Every structure is written in C-alpha cells, then in structure tokens.
Amino acid sequence: MSHHIVEVRDLCHCYPDGTEALRGITFRIHHGESVAVVGANGAGKSTLLLHLNGYLAPTRGDVRIGDTPVVRTTLPEVRRTVGMVFQDPDDQLFMPTVFDDVAFGPLNLGLPPAEVERRVADALEQVGVAHLHNKPPYRLSGGEKRRVAIATVLSMSPDILVLDEPTTGLDPYARRQIMGLLRDFKHTKIITSHDLDMVMELCERTIVLREGRVAADGPTRDIFGNDELLATCRLERPLSMQGCPVCGR
C-alpha cells in the first residue's frame, strides 16, 4: 500500500434517521501533513473521521489510503496504516490491564509474543506511562487514559494518526503533554478539535466543515484570520490571535 495520500472524494453519509452528516466532502492529504478538521457541533467532524479507517461506510463517494480504497475487504490492511484515537478513551480501553489493551492490536496481527511485548513497551514509553502497564484502565485519570488510548494505536505502528478531540477534558498539564506527544509524531496527523490554540500549534493546514460540507481549506493562520468565515461557521479566533482583552493589543 502506498501511504502517501489520504484522498476523500465526494463523500456523503446519511444516517438511518435521515440526517445528512456529510454532503460531498472532497480533499487530499499528503504524507507528513498535520491537518485539523474544525467546525461547530454537528458540522460532521466525527462522522468524517470514522470514514477514514472504515468504521462508517459512505452513502456515496469514496475514501482511499494511497491506492487502496477503504472498503470491507481492505479494512485489515487500512487499519494497520490508519490509527484512530476516539474522543472518549473509554471506548478504546476494554481489557483488564493497560498492557492487555496496548497488546490487543499487535496480537490480532498474529505477531510473535516477543514482538508484541517490544511494541507494547515502546508505545507505553513513547506516551510516558510505562509505569502503568499493570493497572486496570478504570483506575486511570483522564489524562492517563488518553495517553494509553494513543499507545494502543502507536503499538500498531501506523503511518497516519487520526484523533477526535484529543485534549477534551484534560487539565492544562495533561493537555500540554498530549500536545508534545503529537508534535513528536512525524507521520501524517488528522485532528478534530474545538481547542483552536492547539490547532494553531500543531497543524499547518485546517479544513473547516459547515453543515456537512467543506467551507474552507487552507493554511491554518489564514483560516483563523478570516473573521467573516469564522462567524459564518460559528467559530472564533484562537485566544492566541485575539490579543489582550483589556488593552486590545
């Protein structure tokens, strides 16, 4: 599989209740890009991400990872390349211990036990929670759960990391740790978030969704400097671009 391009073409998704969540989404992301997907609640961000490794199937259009279409028959191959971190880490952590959760993916690849242990150790070390390997996930803090959820994906050695609201609910210290971890991941990153200051720091490109459509796609600073666009899409400038609330500078 060529890992250099994530391509979404005329992607539409309609839920069983008739809700049109995505309406003709088209974009291309090259290997190594760090791209944010932003928009108001209900704009279609999470629905879009769930198509990138086949958790949802399109009503119309298609998604490709390199030359490989994301369809039922290619899901094992696609999911080795595209690692998905869900918004709620409790959706991702379901085994008795942290080690078991992080080992789950590599074991299902049929890797030898020694390789599984190496991958688990490396992934936990990368996210700074190696000391938690024997703990049950329900005993972890929110920030610890978030890091372990990322480790479950890193243990699969993905080329593309997809994250849905990775800093939601974290205290400032845990948020900064997660941002440092994501900054160190050198492959492709696709991130949805309402944390626009994080987006400013981590993503050179931003795609704005509005009512299931792409409203804008371009350099992050240009997007957040367009007040008319932000108002139309029910967004605001990041705090770092708003200036001092007292003196206006």
UniProtKB/Swiss-Prot annotation:
Membrane topology value: Peripheral membrane protein
Keyword ATP-binding tagged: yes
Top enzyme class: translocase
Residue numbers binding ATP: 39-46
Principal place of residence: membrane
InterPro entries: AAA+_ATPase, ABC_transporter-like_ATP-bd, ABC_transporter-like_CS, ABC_transpr_CbiO/EcfA_su, Co_trans_ATP-bd, ECF_ABC_transporter_ATP-bd, P-loop_NTPase
Assigned EC number: 7.-.-.-
Subcellular location: Cell inner membrane
Gene Ontology cellular-component terms listed: ATP-binding cassette (ABC) transporter complex
Entries under CDD domains matching the protein: ABC_cobalt_CbiO_domain1
UniProt entry keywords in alphabetical sequence: ATP-binding, Cell inner membrane, Cell membrane, Membrane, Nucleotide-binding, Translocase, Transport
One Pfam family in the UniProt entry: ABC_tran
Role description: Probably part of an ABC transporter complex. Responsible for energy coupling to the transport system.
Alphabetical list of NCBIfam families matching this protein: cbiO
Family: Belongs to the ABC transporter superfamily.
Name used for this protein in its record: Putative ABC transporter ATP-binding protein GSU1281
